[in-house]
Amino acid sequence: MAKIPVTVLSGYLGSGKTTLLNHILQNREGRRIAVIVNDMSEVNIDKDLVADGGGLSRTDEKLVELSNGCICCTLRDDLLKEVERLVKKGGIDQIVIESTGISEPVPVAQTFSYIDDELGIDLTAICRLDTMVTVVDANRFVHDINSEDLLMDRDQSVDETDERSIADLLIDRDQSVDETDERSIADLLIDQVEFCDVLIINKIDLISEEELAKLEKVLSALQPTAKIIKTINSEVDLKEVLNTQRFDFEKASESAGWIKELESGGHASHTPETEEYGISSFVYKRRLPFHAKRFNDWLETMPNNVVRSKGIVWLAQYNHVACLLSQAGSSCNIHPVTYWVASMSEAQQTQILAERQDVAAEWDPEYGDRHTQFVIIGTDLDEEKLTKELDACLVNAQEIDADWQQFEDPYQWQIRPAR
């Protein structure tokens, strides 16, 4: 039996995912499509729009509604079971899953990439994840990426000047977010853009040609491998989103612009066209630690033209752990992720260095594997100025021999030493 191709639609609230889904259903040209729709509202307006707006019965399109939560969180098991049921029942050529506007795409992709031993379900044997589509609202992306709003704080009230469709506005008003969800809108947008192989810039009629050109270059810097398609009302040739055979989990996991920059040491392809619009990136790399207080102060006053920064940071006050810096627009987070090999026992170091040539090749006689390396992506970046500001946050010559644990610490993390 041929594996059924699966397309996943992601995108923030109001971007046009439901419009795209309706477009797919209305132009299916004989394709037998099973649709899995999920939103986080008590009244599934997305579902009603698909069923009624598309003029299609649930029987015809095998519309499946998972109404108890997000498909990539609380309903992961239901999604597995529902997809298995649909495929085994037969009579379909394609599955399309519309994620809720507050969903991250990676967990959905993982559902189709691994065997679930607990449930005894192996979706990899009966279907294949074919295309990960992310829809971006051209008119709101820049505003939302620079917003400091958390998902749970975003006001869903309707503004008379809001140019989104009535359908999208209704969806937005009815989507609900868990009160404990502390994700920012900027973080979610970046997650959705960085993990896709088709990126649809929708509502291009609401911005100027110059704004569109710049937005396209920003998105290309964030996700350099995805195919970018510009649309009005999410109208796209279905061959670009169905049965494209584009998706590869390993490649998708490594396709984000910040990863490409780090892998190339800051020498990824920077096209003249991109630089014409002021879009650039560079890698900051040092073998000295940051003074945590000074670095934190810099993060809090980071220029707003820095769109994305991500990578590993070495903080003097936490000399035994590597920290992950992840910044998206106005949202910034830093936290410990793993122990430096240099902080482990001599026996552990010997074993790891024997097994990991990449670690051994970068080993410093004094500091071991400790280092800072992160990428900065933005518009009209002054690399020299930013580099000087960051260098000023490093432990200086007068501090290098001091007791780093006595430095002012803004984080106050409680972390046990490596064993």
PLM regions and their residue ranges:
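C-terminal accessory "lid"/substrate-recognition subdomains
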Residues: 2, 42, 141-142, 147-373, ...
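Edge beta-strands of jelly-roll/beta-sandwich modules across compartments, strongly enriched
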Residues: 386-388
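His/Asp/Glu-rich metal/cofactor-coordinating catalytic motifs and the adjacent surface-exposed loops
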Residues: 379
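Nucleotide-state-sensitive switch-loop elements of NTP-binding domains
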Residues: 2-182, 186
